[in-house]
Regions:
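Short, low-complexity N-terminal intrinsically disordered segments enriched in polar/charged residues
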Residues: 1-26, 30, 34, 38, ...
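A beta-strand edge to alpha-helix "cap/lid" segment located at domain peripheries
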Residues: 2-5, 69-154
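Generic, low-specificity signal for short hydrophobic/alpha-helical stretches with a mild N-terminal bias
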Residues: 3-6, 18, 42, 46, ...
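A solvent-exposed, acidic/Ser-Thr-rich amphipathic alpha-helical stretch
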Residues: 33-98
Length: 154
C-alpha cells in the first residue's frame, strides 16, 4: 500500500490509534457512554452481532442506553493490535479482546473472547471510528446468543 507516510508518521499515528482503542475500552468500563459516542464519526457503522448494531451516531448512542444498569461492571482487555494504513487519514485495525461482564442481576460473570475489526478515519486531526465490528470466538455465561463469526478456517 503506497500511503505516502514516513516510518515516523506511522509510529506517531499508530500510537494515536492505539489510544482511541484503549479509550473505547476505558469509557465502556467506566460507564461513560457519552464519551464513547465522541469516538465515532456521524455516519459510523457498528456491528456487535447479526442483529445488534447501528448505522449513524444517533443510532449508535441508542445502543448504549442502559449499559450502566445492565452491568455492575465490565473489564475489557485489548491486545495484539495490528494497524494497516490505507492512507494518512484512514486505517484498518484488528484487535484481540477479552471482555468480562458482571451483571446487575444475579448471574455468573459473562466472558467474551473475540476480535474487533475497525476502520478509522482522521477528522480534524483526531482519529475516529468509521466502522467497528465485533467478531466473537467464544463466550462463557454470556448474555448474547448470536454473534459475528471470526472467519476461522475449519
Amino acid at each position: 500500500m503506497d500511503n505516502n507516510m514516513t516510518d515516523i508518521d506511522k509510529v506517531v499515528e499508530s500510537r494515536a490509534i492505539e489510544r482511541i482503542l484503549s479509550d473505547y475500552a476505558y469509557f465502556l468500563d467506566m460507564n461513560m457512554p457519552e464519551e464513547m459516542v465522541k469516538l465515532f464519526v456521524d455516519d459510523c457503522e457498528v456491528s456487535y452481532g447479526p442483529k445488534f448494531g447501528a448505522r449513524g451516531i444517533a443510532d449508535y448512542a441508542k445502543t448504549l442506553d442502559g449499559i450502566g444498569t445492565f452491568f455492575k461492571g465490565t473489564s475489557h482487555h485489548n491486545s495484539g493490535t495490528v494497524i494497516d494504513f490505507v492512507s494518512p487519514t484512514e486505517a484498518v485495525t484488528r484487535t484481540i479482546v477479552l471482555a468480562v461482564h458482571r451483571y446487575a442481576k444475579d448471574a455468573p460473570d459473562g466472558i467474551l473472547y473475540g476480535q474487533y475489526h475497525d476502520r478509522l478515519v482522521k477528522v480534524d486531526g483526531a482519529w475516529k471510528f468509521k466502522a467497528r465490528e465485533l467478531r466473537t470466538t467464544m463466550t462463557t455465561d454470556y448474555h448474547v446468543r448470536s454473534f459475528n463469526p471470526i472467519g476461522r478456517r475449519d
